[in-house]
Structures are given as structure tokens and as C-alpha cells.
């Protein structure tokens, strides 16, 4: 069964605060966004492991300031879609939740902020330069990613030039170990640290002092919030030399499912509410820092 997306009262906040942040986004990012729109590659869509023919909105070709940029990546060798060697053609690990979660979140960014957001996502291949046209980049299930040396170098350059990376939906000690092995190649001399509760990213739009573990759809059947041995959620990140958060690492949670299943009446609404609030803050932070 489906439910309507979260209503406006679910995310109520002072209008003045929205307008101040929106003005900051325009002043900080407006000129750069105009240049980026001119160079963005055309929209492209791939078959996903959960959705193969997702309907397109009418305005899917419109240029915009912000686009949900989803990282395409090769994964560790393995059976099925996880180890698909033809990952550039879709039906691979990077397409988990895609494109439903991307478009549901894009709708909320449009509704809750003054950021001009496109209604559809853009898959990003680090083997070309399109990544530099997008200030915010998301990756799912990074406990399985397996970036090449060339992709690692491009990824590092993107972050140091002002890009923001958010990753999500990986669980337990084994997936964490593999994720950090890759990130240590991206930044050999930068530590992954816990994001302090007073960091701007937790307060730029919504005050997120009362965060909790957001589970995936499996909660509907299992009634447990964790997966594998990931019993507690972790909010970690990597900062640049000026104190800007470059990478927000959401470990032992599944925010992507909270966006994807925003219209699923069986999925608890409180998970979608928090998942959306976190994403709105992260996107706004990326656009204003």
C-alpha cells in the first residue's frame, strides 16, 4: 500500500530560517551553479536491481542548481548484481534503491527549501569529469565498492575542490573495514572522526539533536533496526584543512530506504521523517559551504 509523501507539518520550521539559508545558498553557489548547468551531461537512466522502468516526470530534462548525483562504482567480485562486471550499464550494486529514493528526496528538497532542484537524479561515473558539475554526491552500500586508482584520484580531487560526499546503507564491522580501506587510499593522511553534535550540518535547517538509527525496509518484517553486527548508528565524517565537512559517513543505518519508502504505508513514518530531515540538512550544508 502507498501513502502520501510526508506533509508540510511533518517538517515545520520558521519561514525566516528557510529564507536566510536560501539566500546564503544563492550567494554562495549561484554563479557556480550557472556555470555547472551549462556543462552538465544530459540526463541518463539505467536499469536498477529494484526498478527497471521507472516513470519520468515531465520536467526531467530541465537544468537546475542542485541534482541528486548518485555515484556509479565497480563493486567487489561476487555473484549476482553485486559483482556485475558491466556496472556501467546498471543492474549493479550502486543502483540499490535507485531511482525511487533519489526522486522522492529531490521532491522534498524542492518542497522544503528554496534550492532549485531537478526532479530526477544523475548517475555519476568517475571515469569522466561530470562529477565536478555537482556539489553533492551520494553513494549506497559502500561496504562493497571497489574504486580503481584513477577513480580514487578523481574522487579526491572532487572533494578537495569543494565537493560534498554522503554515503549510506552499509552495516557491521566487515563492511566498515572494506569502506575504510578504500577511503584510506583517497585520503591517506585524513582521519575519519565522529561528527560532533554541535556541527553546523546537524543544525543548518533542522536541529538534529535527537537522531536515532533509521533502518531499511527489512524492519517491517524483522522489527529490528540493525543489520549484521551494526547495532548502533554512527555519524562520522572527514574534514578539510579549513574545517569544512567533505564526507558524511552514515554507517549502520539505511537513510536511502527511508527516502525510497516514503510512500509505503507499512514503513514507519518516523523513519522517513528523520531520514528526510538529515538529507535536507546535508544538501543545504553542501550548497552553502
Features from the language model and the residues they span:
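Surface-exposed patches in mature extracellular/periplasmic domains of secreted proteins
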Residues: 115-125, 167-172, 190-198
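Bacterial N-terminal signal peptides that target proteins for export
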Residues: 2-22
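Bacterial N-terminal signal peptides
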Residues: 21-30
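Aromatic-Pro/Gly-enriched surface loop or interdomain linker
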Residues: 37-136, 142-143, 246, 254-289
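Short alpha-beta junction capping motif
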Residues: 68, 131-176
Amino acid at each position: 500500500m502507498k501513502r502520501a509523501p510526508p506533509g508540510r507539518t511533518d517538517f515545520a520550521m520558521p519561514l525566516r530560517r528557510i529564507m536566510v539559508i536560501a539566500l546564503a545558498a544563492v550567494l554562495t553557489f549561484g554563479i557556480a551553479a550557472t556555470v555547472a548547468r551549462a556543462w552538465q551531461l544530459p540526463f541518463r537512466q539505467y536499469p536498477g536491481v529494484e526498478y527497471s522502468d521507472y516513470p519520468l516526470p515531465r520536467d526531467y530534462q530541465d537544468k537546475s542548481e542542485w541534482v541528486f548525483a548518485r555515484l556509479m562504482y565497480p563493486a567487489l567480485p561476487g555473484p549476482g548484481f553485486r559483482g556485475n562486471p558491466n556496472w556501467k550499464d546498471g543492474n549493479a550494486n550502486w543502483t540499490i534503491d535507485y531511482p525511487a529514493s533519489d526522486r522522492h528526496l529531490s521532491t522534498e528538497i524542492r518542497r522544503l527549501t528554496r534550492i532549485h532542484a531537478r526532479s530526477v537524479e544523475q548517475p555519476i561515473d568517475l571515469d569522466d569529469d561530470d562529477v565536478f558539475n555537482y556539489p553533492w554526491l551520494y553513494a549506497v552500500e559502500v561496504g562493497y565498492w571497489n574504486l580503481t586508482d584513477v577513480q580514487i584520484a578523481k574522487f579526491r580531487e572532487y572533494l578537495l575542490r569543494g565537493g560534498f560526499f554522503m554515503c549510506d546503507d552499509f552495516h557491521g564491522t566487515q563492511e566498515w573495514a572494506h569502506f575504510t580501506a578504500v577511503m584510506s587510499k583517497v585520503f591517506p593522511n585524513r582521519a575519519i572522526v565522529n561528527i560532533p553534535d554541535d556541527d553546523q550540518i546537524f543544525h543548518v535547517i533542522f536541529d538534529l539533536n535527537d537522531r536515532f538509527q533509521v533502518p531499511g525496509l527489512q524492519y517491517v518484517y524483522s522489527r529490528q533496526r540493525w543489520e549484521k553486527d551494526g547495532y548502533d548508528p554512527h555519524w562520522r565524517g572527514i574534514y578539510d584543512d579549513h574545517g569544512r565537512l567533505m564526507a558524511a559517513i552514515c554507517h549502520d543505518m539505511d537513510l536511502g530506504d527511508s527516502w525510497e519508502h516514503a510512500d509505503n504505508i507499512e514503513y514507519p513514518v518516523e523513519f522517513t521523517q528523520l531520514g528526510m530531515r538529515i538529507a535536507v540538512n546535508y544538501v543545504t550544508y553542501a550548497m552553502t559551504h
